[in-house]
Amino acid sequence: RSYGRMLGMVAHLAHDRAALQDLLGLLANKQLVLIDTTGVAPRDPRKDEILDLLDLPGVQKLLAVNAAGQGDALDDVMQAFKARGSSQAILTKVDEAVKLGPSVDTLIRHQMQLRGVTNGQRVPEDWERADAQQLVSASMRASTRSAFDPKALDLDFFFPPSSPSTMDSEV
């Protein structure tokens, strides 16, 4: 309800499918009705129950994707929710992402239609339309080196330079 007030909208609460159907009937003349659910992890047993509530005619599911998420975790989310009919996404927390590559890659590979991005905590000021060129460009540059980027000393330790004489003796 607090988000509704911040956006200048009336927020309603639906505890079950019947209540949601009733509300959607009352709001049928509205141009846009947003349904916000509790966030659930891909393997959360409540996921199917929550998504079943949204299996109603005319309801389009948008998946909120954390831009700061780790690549394999994002892939897991996409697989779980795309299987349940999600084909559109909002890329959130872009301002918190150290690297955008994993999230942009995951959206592209899963062919998700990106509807917008969020760049901060202020609603609705920090909402932006998705700009493919800007996102791809941002994902290709890193403002800082990662702690996981190899350093020359590390590479020399794990992969010592080989000399021709040591290679001959190993054969």
Explain the meaning of each model-derived region.
Residues 1:
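Phosphate-binding active sites in nucleotide-utilizing proteins
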Residues 4-49, 55:
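Switch II (G3) loop of P-loop NTPases
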Residues 58-65, 82-124:
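Conserved beta-strand/loop subsegment of P-loop NTPase cores
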Residues 107-171:
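NTP-binding/hydrolysis catalytic cores, primarily Walker-type P-loop NTPases
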Residues 20, 50-51, 78, 103-104:
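Generic hydrophobic/aromatic pocket-lining and core-packing "Φ" positions
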Residues 40-44, 57-74, 97:
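Conserved Switch II/interswitch segment of TRAFAC-class P-loop GTPases
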Residues 33-37, 82, 86, 135-144:
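A polyampholytic, Gly/Pro-enriched intrinsically disordered region
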